[in-house]
Swiss-Prot record:
This is Polyphenol oxidase B, chloroplastic. The lineage of its organism: Eukaryota, Viridiplantae, Streptophyta, Embryophyta, Tracheophyta. It comes from Solanum lycopersicum. One of its GO terms (cellular component) is chloroplast thylakoid lumen. Cu cation B binds at H329, H333, H371. Residues 8-23 have a biased composition (Low complexity). InterPro entries: Di-copper_centre_dom_sf, Polyphenol_oxidase, Polyphenol_oxidase_C, Polyphenol_oxidase_cen, Tyrosinase/Hemocyanin, Tyrosinase_Cu-bd. Belongs to the tyrosinase family.
Amino acid sequence: MASVVCNSSSSTTTTTLKTPFTSLGSTPKPSQLFLHGKRNKTFKVSCKVINNNGNQDETNSVDRRNVLLGLGGLYGVANAIPLAASATPIPSPDLKTCGRATISDGPLVPYSCCPPPMPTNFDTIPYYKFPSMTKLRIRTPAHAVDEEYIAKYNLAISRMRDLDKTEPLNPLGFKQQANIHCAYCNGAYIIGGKELQVHNSWLFFPFHRWYLYFYERILGKLIDDPTFALPYWNWDHPKGMRLPPMFDREGSSLYDERRNQQVRNGTVLDLGSFGDKVETTQLQLMSNNLTLMYRQMVTNAPCPLLFFGAPYVLGNNVEAPGTIETIPHIPVHIWAGTVRGSKFPNGDVSYGEDMGNFYSAGLDPVFYCHHGNVDRMWNEWKAIGGKRRDISEKDWLNSEFFFYDEHKNPYRVKVRDCLDTKKMGYDYAPMPTPWRNFKPKSKASVGKVNTSTLPPANEVFPLAKMDKTISFAINRPASSRTQQEKNEQEEMLTFNNIRYDNRGYIRFDVFLNVDNNVNANELDKAEFAGSYTSLPHVHRAGENDHIAKVNFQLAITELLEDIGLEDEDTIAVTLVPKKGGEGISIENVEIKLVDC
């Protein structure tokens, strides 16, 4: 089983595409999805000019030779999107064209997230070259560090915060570093008439890897320790499924007042959190977490684009994140941030700050610890084997970002240079990964659900709102397929034209071979197929409403094997709304066989 989230337009066409990957030895597996496309064209970029004190100048049009926006999308998206131009690799944005960022589901950010004034002509900024090293920096799990390390980490963050007071425009300062995420993620840069966004696509992993790389080196510079390494929040292991204690010490430089106070003091983390507390035991919650990790790292991500996310497409707002970005990356942000709609002591309304909103996430030191483990998952995923390897598509490899190094020198960086952490000078201290062997085996049901008692899909859809659990029967295009047929084609459970207001949290879970009596708080069951999730979005330039229109696909070949439904012509599907279901509509659902 593998999941794909895709944008749709008024008409959708399903297409088989191919993607080249870097050459690593592997054994083919049944669930493999490939994408490919050719593009090479220049186009104009319309950018807002704003200086660092927030004063906006007139709009400029900048000729960009390398502006991405990747190739087609996942399956139907490739042909459904009206392309404004052929896509080319995304360049590092011209920081002189930075505009005001917007709070997701809120007003403009009340300050400028743009970087300090450029010391030189942007076109002359060099590409970064790794400095020589004699020893790898080793990132360790945050729950296992000693007091000596905590003191050193506190000192580094404290000195970074001090720069905010003494040199507010110093790019090494704490707020300036946090603003990097705000600018790249909340609409400060306009490319091709659309906000540049490093989430929801294949840019997610490489952007954050480079971001942490320079952040880590800056911390080391501030305490004169070139071997200093960030910790990682080991939330994929039961021992790390809590807020790391060093971040929960009031008065320390690692503490953030704008966190959800309910997650303190050893509260078990919910890797599927979408704002509501799950009424279950700590043991069940940890079991759910390990199940989610297995689904997102193994079952749902047998091939690169499912893990990394879709290519970024020119002229279209890509909303096709990879598995780990959706869960657990997003839920950890939500879990740690303040509750949206609650009030701060000064009377301001929360938009999820700090961790729960991209513009402010970098203001919480735990953000970098969280993304340390997200980055570690990239390494762990490739280590599983099979088709799990880095993308070799040039539009990905040649995409660029911009950062200041620890000496305040500006550099451009490419995705192709961040594929090997050891070449970058760091590695991760090994920890057991119990989720790798946590494939759900117990079943929520005994035998096959009687599908004759369920309404057929064509009587349930179109669905106006998902305000309750919904079960239906759906026909398969073929049954009793041979192994060769499974290798050649993936069986895809496809939800066409899902619509919802993108200003709120959205999540619904999908189960096979259960009815509406399923206990949806127990995810460690073989019938759990996956989840559709969405965070509140920034209202993008050119949008006339807040309605998201997406397709959602789950590859179910492996799942049908696990629950013994390979020979059935009709199967039962159950949808369980977890967040925002009353605002979700779905046009239709079908099962397709798609070439791999």
